[in-house]
From Swiss-Prot:
Domain called BRX: residue spans: 140-221, 315-370
Renumbered residue ranges of the record's region Disordered: 231-316
GO cellular component: nucleus
Family: Belongs to the BRX family.
Name the UniProt record assigns to this protein: Protein Brevis radix-like 3
Disruption-associated phenotype: No visible phenotype.
Polar residues bias: start-end ranges: 231-248, 266-291
Organism: Arabidopsis thaliana (Mouse-ear cress)
Amino acid sequence: MLTCIACTKQLNTNNGGSTREEDEEHGVIGTPRTKQAIKSLTSQLKDMAVKASGAYKNCKPCSGTTNRNQNRNYADSDAASDSGRFHYSYQRAGTATSTPKIWGNEMESRLKGISSEEGTPTSMSGRTESIVFMEDDEVKEWVAQVEPGVLITFVSLPQGGNDLKRIRFRSTRFPYYRDQLLLWCRQGWVFWPQNCREMFNKWQAQKWWVENFEKVMELYNVQFNQQSVPLQTPPVSEDGGSQIQSVKDSPVTPPLERERPHRNIPGSSGFASTPKLSSISGTKTETSSIDGSARSSSVDRSEEVSVSNASDMESEWVEQDEPGIYITIRALPDGNRELRRVRFSRDKFGETHARLWWEQNRARIQQQYL
């Protein structure tokens, strides 16, 4: 049987002896019954410390004026001890269940502060935290799918509008490329599937861009960034599609001016390898044209806007410089000549060969025909 420390009193004698406090004050502690009670209390304290540490703190103190016998005193002490254990265990359980609630309230208050763009409120434990919002200075890119298999990457400009960064033509539009099947392209009597695959894929991509240039410019509010650097040729992607990166001033695009281009420009310039009817041979041949616009006068090229109409067609003519090379020349009202385009026959020139020839003979053509 365990007794409560606060309830432990010296047992009253039959003749109305003094209490334990009175004995301590007078120094009267030496009777056998008192020593036995002290030993019993010491052993009980050890058991309480091991089994139910802290239970005695919740025990109610007993009044010192009430006289009880030994059995009643021990019974009351046991009941108080059991009650203290139960109360202590209940208190510990309540503390465990209330901790998540307190933590939940703290997190909820922090989330409310974040959502309202305020500082994090002071937590219940006294800690404070601050949230720093950093502005994103990186270039924002986004991709738009204009048609199935045609993906255009735009860059949002700080002053408004979008800059066209990349056009990608996925090979899913042409299932034969994706499956890596043979593409029959006759070059003489020899078939070159790999070379023909690259040429035909670029031809499809360039044709689509010439036809849909104005629609993309108007629909996506494209305003080219002056710092963009164009590439010479649109590279072929890993999946068989072609990419046109930084299409500003690229040979595949119509001439870009500060004003919006006219409707008839796609047919008049650009590296458009669409089938054309040659005015020299009179037969339908696939030709690739390079915009070789160059004027002998000192007029700025950016201020020149070429519009194809009936009067322009009357002042233009075609000359054959070499077999398979056709040069279109136009006479200007001021008496000067303008080199409109140079066309190469597909039967004799590939794209790389045509560009190399033009770089080597550009000065000669301008001096000879202009």
